[in-house]
Protein backbone atom coordinates (compact mmCIF):
# COMPACT_ATOMS: atom_id res chain seq x y z
CA UNK A 1 0.00 0.00 0.00
CA UNK A 2 1.60 3.23 -1.16
CA UNK A 3 1.02 6.17 1.02
CA UNK A 4 1.63 9.72 -0.03
CA UNK A 5 3.47 11.57 2.70
CA UNK A 6 2.14 14.84 3.85
CA UNK A 7 4.76 17.64 3.95
CA UNK A 8 4.92 17.45 7.76
CA UNK A 9 5.56 13.67 7.63
CA UNK A 10 8.31 14.06 5.00
CA UNK A 11 10.00 16.81 7.01
CA UNK A 12 9.80 14.74 10.16
CA UNK A 13 11.23 11.68 8.39
CA UNK A 14 14.17 13.72 6.98
CA UNK A 15 14.82 15.18 10.43
CA UNK A 16 14.82 11.71 12.04
CA UNK A 17 17.13 10.32 9.34
CA UNK A 18 19.53 13.22 9.80
CA UNK A 19 19.47 12.79 13.58
CA UNK A 20 20.09 9.04 13.28
CA UNK A 21 22.98 9.62 10.88
CA UNK A 22 24.39 12.22 13.26
CA UNK A 23 24.35 9.71 16.10
CA UNK A 24 26.07 6.99 14.10
CA UNK A 25 28.44 8.83 11.76
CA UNK A 26 30.65 10.97 14.03
CA UNK A 27 31.97 8.14 16.23
CA UNK A 28 32.65 6.01 13.17
CA UNK A 29 34.28 8.89 11.31
CA UNK A 30 36.32 9.86 14.37
CA UNK A 31 37.49 6.28 14.84
CA UNK A 32 38.47 6.01 11.19
CA UNK A 33 40.47 9.23 11.34
CA UNK A 34 42.00 8.66 14.77
CA UNK A 35 44.20 5.73 13.76
CA UNK A 36 47.26 6.86 11.80
CA UNK A 37 48.41 4.53 9.07
CA UNK A 38 51.96 4.40 10.48
CA UNK A 39 51.04 2.67 13.75
CA UNK A 40 52.67 -0.71 14.26
CA UNK A 41 52.06 -3.70 16.51
CA UNK A 42 53.97 -3.83 19.78
CA UNK A 43 57.62 -4.85 19.51
CA UNK A 44 58.11 -8.56 20.09
CA UNK A 45 59.65 -9.62 23.39
CA UNK A 46 63.13 -10.99 22.75
CA UNK A 47 63.75 -8.98 19.58
CA UNK A 48 66.59 -6.47 19.38
CA UNK A 49 65.45 -2.88 19.88
CA UNK A 50 67.78 -0.44 18.12
CA UNK A 51 67.99 3.12 19.43
CA UNK A 52 68.63 6.50 17.81
CA UNK A 53 69.63 9.90 19.18
CA UNK A 54 66.72 12.16 20.12
CA UNK A 55 66.56 15.87 20.96
CA UNK A 56 64.96 16.26 24.40
CA UNK A 57 62.12 18.70 25.02
CA UNK A 58 63.83 20.14 28.09
CA UNK A 59 67.06 20.67 26.18
CA UNK A 60 69.90 18.29 25.65
CA UNK A 61 69.89 15.07 23.72
CA UNK A 62 69.19 11.41 24.36
CA UNK A 63 72.29 9.47 23.36
CA UNK A 64 71.77 5.74 22.71
CA UNK A 65 75.18 5.06 24.29
CA UNK A 66 73.60 6.07 27.64
CA UNK A 67 71.38 3.01 27.44
CA UNK A 68 73.99 0.42 26.48
CA UNK A 69 74.08 -2.29 29.14
CA UNK A 70 71.25 -0.58 31.03
CA UNK A 71 67.50 -0.93 31.24
CA UNK A 72 65.61 1.63 29.15
CA UNK A 73 61.89 2.35 29.46
CA UNK A 74 60.33 3.83 26.32
CA UNK A 75 56.97 5.48 26.97
CA UNK A 76 54.76 6.79 24.15
CA UNK A 77 52.26 9.35 25.49
CA UNK A 78 50.34 12.54 24.61
CA UNK A 79 49.30 15.62 26.57
CA UNK A 80 45.64 15.07 25.58
CA UNK A 81 45.51 11.36 26.52
CA UNK A 82 43.46 10.70 29.71
CA UNK A 83 45.11 7.31 30.24
CA UNK A 84 48.56 8.87 29.92
CA UNK A 85 47.49 11.48 32.49
CA UNK A 86 46.89 8.61 34.92
CA UNK A 87 50.11 6.73 34.10
CA UNK A 88 52.56 9.64 33.78
CA UNK A 89 52.72 10.43 37.53
CA UNK A 90 53.66 6.78 38.11
CA UNK A 91 56.35 7.03 35.44
CA UNK A 92 57.74 10.07 37.27
CA UNK A 93 57.79 8.08 40.53
CA UNK A 94 59.62 5.24 38.77
CA UNK A 95 62.15 7.70 37.32
CA UNK A 96 62.73 9.36 40.70
CA UNK A 97 63.13 6.04 42.52
CA UNK A 98 65.22 4.12 39.97
CA UNK A 99 67.39 6.49 37.94
CA UNK A 100 70.07 6.27 40.64
CA UNK A 101 70.13 2.51 40.03
CA UNK A 102 70.85 3.02 36.33
CA UNK A 103 67.33 3.15 34.88
CA UNK A 104 67.14 5.05 31.60
CA UNK A 105 63.87 6.48 30.30
CA UNK A 106 62.73 8.14 27.10
CA UNK A 107 59.16 9.40 26.98
CA UNK A 108 58.02 10.03 23.40
CA UNK A 109 55.22 12.57 22.97
CA UNK A 110 52.96 12.02 19.97
CA UNK A 111 51.38 15.49 20.21
CA UNK A 112 51.04 17.17 16.79
CA UNK A 113 53.59 19.82 17.79
CA UNK A 114 56.12 19.94 20.64
CA UNK A 115 54.55 22.97 22.38
CA UNK A 116 51.66 21.14 24.12
CA UNK A 117 54.06 18.47 25.36
CA UNK A 118 56.51 21.04 26.75
CA UNK A 119 53.67 22.94 28.46
CA UNK A 120 52.26 19.72 29.93
CA UNK A 121 55.63 18.55 31.27
CA UNK A 122 56.21 21.95 32.89
CA UNK A 123 52.71 22.16 34.36
CA UNK A 124 53.04 18.70 35.92
CA UNK A 125 56.70 19.18 36.96
CA UNK A 126 57.77 16.00 35.18
CA UNK A 127 61.52 15.62 34.93
CA UNK A 128 61.87 12.32 33.07
CA UNK A 129 63.63 12.66 29.71
CA UNK A 130 61.07 13.37 27.00
CA UNK A 131 61.24 13.93 23.25
CA UNK A 132 58.68 14.97 20.66
CA UNK A 133 57.96 12.25 18.13
CA UNK A 134 58.07 14.43 15.02
CA UNK A 135 58.38 13.04 11.49
CA UNK A 136 62.16 12.52 11.69
CA UNK A 137 62.12 10.77 15.05
CA UNK A 138 59.05 8.74 13.99
CA UNK A 139 61.29 6.79 11.60
CA UNK A 140 63.55 5.70 14.47
CA UNK A 141 60.83 5.20 17.09
CA UNK A 142 57.61 4.28 15.24
CA UNK A 143 54.64 4.45 17.57
CA UNK A 144 53.04 1.08 18.24
CA UNK A 145 49.25 0.92 18.10
CA UNK A 146 47.49 2.19 21.22
CA UNK A 147 48.26 4.77 23.87
CA UNK A 148 49.98 4.87 26.24
CA UNK A 149 52.57 2.33 25.19
CA UNK A 150 55.37 1.18 27.50
CA UNK A 151 58.31 -0.86 26.23
CA UNK A 152 61.23 -2.05 28.36
CA UNK A 153 64.55 -2.61 26.63
CA UNK A 154 66.68 -4.92 28.73
CA UNK A 155 70.38 -4.65 29.47
CA UNK A 156 71.03 -6.92 26.49
CA UNK A 157 69.38 -4.48 24.05
CA UNK A 158 66.34 -6.70 23.51
CA UNK A 159 62.68 -6.09 24.28
CA UNK A 160 62.04 -7.40 27.80
CA UNK A 161 58.42 -6.22 28.11
CA UNK A 162 55.91 -4.44 25.87
CA UNK A 163 52.56 -3.13 27.11
CA UNK A 164 49.74 -1.33 25.31
CA UNK A 165 47.32 0.74 27.37
CA UNK A 166 47.40 2.26 30.81
CA UNK A 167 49.44 0.44 33.44
CA UNK A 168 48.31 0.37 37.06
CA UNK A 169 50.66 1.99 39.61
CA UNK A 170 51.87 -1.40 40.83
CA UNK A 171 52.61 -2.45 37.23
CA UNK A 172 54.72 0.66 36.63
CA UNK A 173 56.61 0.04 39.89
CA UNK A 174 57.26 -3.55 38.75
CA UNK A 175 59.18 -2.28 35.71
CA UNK A 176 62.11 -1.90 38.12
CA UNK A 177 62.42 -5.71 38.24
CA UNK A 178 64.37 -5.53 34.97
CA UNK A 179 67.20 -3.56 36.63
Predicted regions and their residues:
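Alpha/beta-hydrolase fold active-site loops
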Residues: 71-72, 148
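Thiol-based oxidoreductase modules, predominantly thioredoxin-like and allied folds used
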Residues: 103-114, 128-134
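N-proximal helix/coil linker or "cap" segments that precede and/or mark the start of modular domains
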Residues: 28-51, 119
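A short beta-strand-turn-helix
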Residues: 52-71
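N-terminal secretory signal peptides
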Residues: 1-14, 18-27
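Conserved helix-turn-beta segment immediately C-terminal to the redox Cys motif
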Residues: 88-107
Amino acid sequence: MNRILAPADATRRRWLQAAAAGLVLPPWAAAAQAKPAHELPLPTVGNALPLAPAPLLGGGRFDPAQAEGRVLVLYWWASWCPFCAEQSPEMQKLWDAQRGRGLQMLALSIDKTPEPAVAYLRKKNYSFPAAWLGPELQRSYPKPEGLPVTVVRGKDGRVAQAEKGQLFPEDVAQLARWL
